[in-house]
Amino acid sequence: MTITKLLLASIDEAYDRRSWHGTNLRGSLRGVTSGQAAWRPADDGHNIWELVVHAAFWKYDIRRRLGGEKGRSFALEGSNFWARPIEGTMAEWKADLLLLQREHDALRRAVEAFPAARWAKKAPGKPFMFEGLARGVAAHDLYHAGQIQLLKRLQN
């Protein structure tokens, strides 16, 4: 198996494919309503909705780094964490879930297109290799999947 295929497998398992580790990011979001997504554990704590948009942003950021893109902006103004919800409607929640899916699909395409010889090269401005960016986005998805699972349990 090539490094690209291994990285894609890790990214997919962390996002929406079955794996030994349990719930992935998409699985943690299955059946979550806009109300559940908006629930906040504390005044200064992030809710599920904010974690979804945050995960979408970092998929976008890593895709940009892999593709060497400059000047393009994320679908939402700002970076890292956005206050959510704005309206709190199911339509708004579904739109942000779709944003996450679109960014995941775009990231997959960027990983597939990335030259295999460059995975071991250092990412510009970063202390780690491109391969670490791809592995990191998978770890990031699983980290937040765990947070989401905990937030759901706290609501019960």
Segments predicted by a language model, with ranges:
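Acidic/histidine-rich alpha-helical segments that form the ligand environment
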Residues: 83-121, 132-137
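Short, contiguous alpha-helical
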Residues: 1-4, 8-22, 26-29, 34-83, ...
